[in-house]
């Protein structure tokens, strides 16, 4: 199970004891068994759902929600998931909130906290009507404790002829490499303008990330310079992340970058400029040259080697 799915289940469990996990795709035995450790499972297992076609998955989610009289639909805040449940919200006529990072129940009313205006503020909102559709930041909630006895797994019938066909699946290029996705990782190591080329970025940012089992991220400056791919960009025009630990290496702290990571639980920064804006947001800061400090950190983490 991906960490983001665990976060969605964790949020749902905090809100209600009566939850069900809907699993979609093909050949789902392994993920069904994993999901059943946390909640009863409805398994939508069909070849027509094997490909990541959002309108088909949204159709199934909406049909199941109607059949189950669901009051709340929860998913993780990935680009893919928001595309799917956003469509489902439209089909169901429900209200939706994305990127939720916290909540509270007040007199039976669910109040949600989410960043707005590029992360400048955290707003508390209340959704009206039913069902309510919510996506939560992957690192905002922990997966609940697994049950001693697995919950039941119930297959659901899929009418392939009733699925939308407006979008046809062609191909999928899967990401290669052992590092986790930057939007779901519990630790993110990001590099900024201080790194002069892609080799230096990989040696320092990638090296520290590998020592920590972390994902790598990048500032917009490195993407614009062609040093890192767009898929690594963290910020207002890139990925929005909120890991348990965010390490900013040679990143000054431009507003557009802060918008993408300021809700991280712990922020640590290394920058040779003591007046860099990133230090105003960092929980821990080290004034120094990343070319000197990062190799020392990597060596310590690797047992002094």
Model segments located where?
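N-terminal glycine-rich FAD/FM-binding segment characteristic of electron-transfer flavoproteins
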Residues: 1-305
């Amino acid at each position: 199970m991906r960490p983001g799915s665990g976060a969605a289940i964790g949020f749902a469990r905090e809100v209600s004891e009566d939850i069900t996990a809907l699993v979609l795709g093909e050949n789902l035995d392994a993920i069904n068994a994993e999901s059943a450790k946390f909640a009863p499972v409805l398994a939508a297992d069909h070849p027509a759902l094997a490909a990541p076609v959002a309108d088909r998955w949204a159709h199934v989610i909406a049909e199941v929600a109607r059949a189950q009289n669901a009051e709340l639909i929860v998913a993780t805040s990935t680009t893919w998931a928001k595309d799917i449940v956003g469509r489902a919200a439209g089909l169901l006529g429900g209200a939706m909130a994305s990127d939720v990072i916290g909540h509270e129940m007040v007199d039976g009313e669910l109040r949600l906290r989410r960043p707005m205006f590029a992360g400048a503020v955290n707003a508390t909102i209340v959704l009206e009507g039913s069902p309510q559709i919510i996506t939560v930041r992957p690192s905002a909630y922990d997966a609940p404790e697994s049950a001693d006895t697995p919950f039941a797994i119930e297959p659901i019938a899929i009418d392939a002829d009733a699925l939308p066909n407006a979008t046809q699946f062609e191909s999928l290029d899967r990401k290669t490499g052992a590092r986790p996705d930057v939007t779901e990782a519990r630790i993110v190591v990001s590099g900024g303008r201080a790194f002069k080329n892609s080799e230096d970025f990989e040696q320092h940012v990638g090296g520290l990330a590998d020592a920590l089992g972390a994902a790598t991220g990048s500032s917009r400056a490195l993407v614009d310079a062609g040093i890192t791919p767009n898929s690594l960009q963290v910020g207002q025009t890139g990925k929005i992340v909120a890991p348990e630990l965010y390490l900013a290496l040679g990143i000054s702290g431009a507003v557009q970058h802060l918008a993408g990571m300021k809700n991280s639980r712990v922020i640590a920064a290394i920058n040779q400029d003591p007046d860099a804006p990133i230090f105003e947001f960092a929980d821990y800061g080290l004034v120094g040259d990343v070319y000197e400090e990062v190799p020392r950190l990597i060596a310590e983490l690797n047992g002094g080697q």
